[in-house]
Amino acid sequence: LYYPLGGWIINDIDTNTDYEIPLSDPKQSATIATTSYIVNREVNDKLWTPNLPFFFPSYFLDNMPSFQLGMINTAANTALALSRVMPPLPDGENKPNRLDTAVEMLQYPGTVWLFSLENNLVPAPSSTKQYRRAIRQLNKYNQALSAGIIVFTPRAGDLKTILALTGGNLKRANLDLEKQIREFSSSWFDGKADNVFY
């Protein structure tokens, strides 16, 4: 019962889109706040399942790990798009843009627990540790906006840049789905279609 019951209890895919994230200051970015909220929801409010080893009951879960990886990938792409248009911190040559740091942390592989399989089982920072760091960087950037340390003046060109990057991400996701359908639609069973979907 350990694996089926434990997996059933852990399994939690939140597809609700009806979120209103309150801002403490109108100068803050709602997009950054929402991105931080979603990452926090998947990493802290839930159990992060993609990196757990076989002795956790979530090891045999299929859709939830794929969903969580997809949410982090979307958060990374959103932060990357914002980093292209949002101003850096003052003295940017000496201080890294906190959005750039958040992007780097969110692009970290989501399957690292205590050791990296890609690096001969050498101890490595866990995925959750890196994603929590990303949350802090996103929140600090919004705090800098609120304090007036960073001033963002929206321009039409900024929206165009964000929409172009977002459109490119959606196109790649659509191509992945089309490829899966094209290559496996004639199969009796396709165990990866749901993973690609999520």
Give the positions of each predicted feature.
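Hydrophobic membrane-insertion alpha-helices, especially the h-region
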Residues: 1-4
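N-terminal leader regions that mediate targeting or early regulatory function
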Residues: 11-12
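N-terminal Sec/ER secretory leader and immediately downstream segment
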Residues: 15-118
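Extended amphipathic alpha-helical interaction segments
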Residues: 121-198
